């Protein structure tokens, strides 16, 4: 048998997309935020797709990793199945919390949720795997008993030291 043939050099199959420039903007109450499907972003087609969905101007807050995030000015309509598959979560920011997310601070997050009539809060932020299920369970128990009518998710601001509570559309 002959030794394997090794070809060096050449171009990568797909050039990395350079137009997903992350910008630091401080999110504010009333802004919209969406977590985009990571595979769509990795494919390099995210910006082309975002231009077709009528969300107005948008800014990449995080374009890498498991939770690519954009801030945008208009609500995203997710009733179409194609849309729902490409947007993991979308909502309007109702509160920014300047605290670490720990078991000790969970009550502060719950109180803020109650002020906004939130009955379910899903954590969509990277946390220590040992504490995440405990925190999620604490949120579920405390909020379910209070009968809030809205669903929300919790994100960590990728460029800041705060958490965003976002009410789902």
Where are these regions (language model features)?
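Class I S-adenosyl-L-methionine
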Residues: 1-169
């Amino acid at each position: 048998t002959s030794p394997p043939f090794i070809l060096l050099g050449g171009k990568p199959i797909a050039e990395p997309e350079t137009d997903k420039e992350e910008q630091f903007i401080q999110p504010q109450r009333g802004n919209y935020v969406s977590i985009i499907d990571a595979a769509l972003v990795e494919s390099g087609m995210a910006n082309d797709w975002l231009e077709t969905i009528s969300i107005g101007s948008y800014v990449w807050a995080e374009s890498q990793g498991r939770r690519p995030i954009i801030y945008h000015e208009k609500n995203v309509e997710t009733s179409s199945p194609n849309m729902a598959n490409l947007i993991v979560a979308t909502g309007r920011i109702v509160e920014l919390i300047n605290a670490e997310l720990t078991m000790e601070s969970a009550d502060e997050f719950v109180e803020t949720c109650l002020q906004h009539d939130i009955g379910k809060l899903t954590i969509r932020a990277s946390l220590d795997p040992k504490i995440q299920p405990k925190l999620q369970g604490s949120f579920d128990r405390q909020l379910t008993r209070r009968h809030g009518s809205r669903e929300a998710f919790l994100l960590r601001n990728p460029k800041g030291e705060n958490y965003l509570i976002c009410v789902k559309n």
